[in-house]
């Protein structure tokens, strides 16, 4: 998917750590990347597929990935800080949801959605909300346990957290090779 493409664009230095495409004029005339980049209304685009129905990756596509990456990573760091937990103390990082089951660890870490330090700790659990709903419907004990757990949960407004804007801005940067 798009994360795999962005990871490769970063790896090949077609996209810089700030999320911008490299400039065509900065490439040598024999650079293979020249054939994969084009200008369209003064905006750079990457040609993913060039046959009859072109598939392009635009600067806007990269920015959308970058914003999602910044939100997820900054939320991850903010939660660690609030819980006063060091990243090295994490036993596992659980990825839930149907979407998460289709995203590789390589892409999550390669794009910087999650830090490389948790690479070996990532565990996929599938559609946990659906499983939880089934459990709540089928078991009074499970439902009671969920109710008790919900009373222990705390709400955290990321945007209102001290220093969050700076953290978010820092987390927008893509990892470098």
Which residues fall in each region the model found?
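Helical "lid/coupling" subdomains associated with nucleotide-phosphate turnover
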Residues: 1-177
């Amino acid at each position: 998917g798009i994360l795999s493409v962005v990871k490769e664009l970063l790896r090949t230095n077609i996209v810089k750590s700030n999320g911008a495409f490299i400039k065509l004029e900065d490439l040598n005339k024999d650079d293979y990347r020249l054939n994969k980049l084009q200008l369209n209304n003064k905006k750079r685009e990457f040609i993913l597929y060039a046959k009859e129905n072109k598939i392009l990756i635009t600067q806007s596509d990269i920015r959308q990935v970058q914003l999602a990456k910044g939100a997820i990573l900054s939320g991850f760091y903010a939660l660690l800080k609030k819980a006063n937990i060091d990243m090295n103390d994490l036993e596992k990082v659980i990825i839930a949801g149907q979407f998460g089951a289709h995203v590789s660890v390589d892409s999550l870490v390669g794009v910087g959605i999650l830090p490389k330090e948790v690479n070996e700790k990532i565990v996929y659990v599938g559609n946990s909300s659906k499983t939880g709903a089934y459990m709540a419907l089928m078991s009074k004990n499970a439902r009671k346990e969920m109710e008790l757990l919900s009373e222990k949960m705390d709400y955290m407004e990321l945007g209102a957290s001290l220093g969050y804007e700076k953290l978010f801005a820092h987390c927008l940067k893509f990892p470098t090779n």
